[in-house]
């Protein structure tokens, strides 16, 4: 896997930003003629499918690749991975930082302009954990036509992004759930999902997962049921032995990558030996 740490000037955020991009590349077995037809090239046969992978609170663009084997999983399955640093801004507009615009418009513009990855919705996916799960739902339901599928792991479906950005972590209880439901519909996963339904648009396919020892398990189950009631195609996974933790997310990101409803040529070729 070719791994790039990119630092560039964002025209949305008006400052330099860091992202990590991993791109499938020639493997050691391929370079030694142990797999494939013996020929090697750094020119892809087609543009790679891409997964925009969002981190959780307190993390950054390097956390997913540091705490999981996502590089290995992506290399085996030949899919590009894009990680960014969204601070604790929940991937929405807070103050002068418009991370919603950055993620939805500028990040794909930069990545697709600089790397051999697809712009086609058929080959574009988004996923995230905790705060990143919240961001995934907001972006996927704001622009459902842009993503084939989404993955939300231990998603903070009732997060208050403004309080989070100020260092205030609100209790995820029934009272707070009602408060979230009445918030600005532009940043409420619940309201955005209802809007997709009301406008008659198809939902991206949904992969939803949460550990049963996680304090937000019940809110995840409730949101899963809400999506099903709205007509979304939801795949659900849970594990009795895990809470809000990286060992669970490492398991889930591999399951998610295997689950993706891919139609690209690389998927048809099957998993590679690394």
Segment roles from a protein language model:
Residues 1-274:
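Non-catalytic cap/lid and distal C-terminal segments of serine-dependent acyl enzymes
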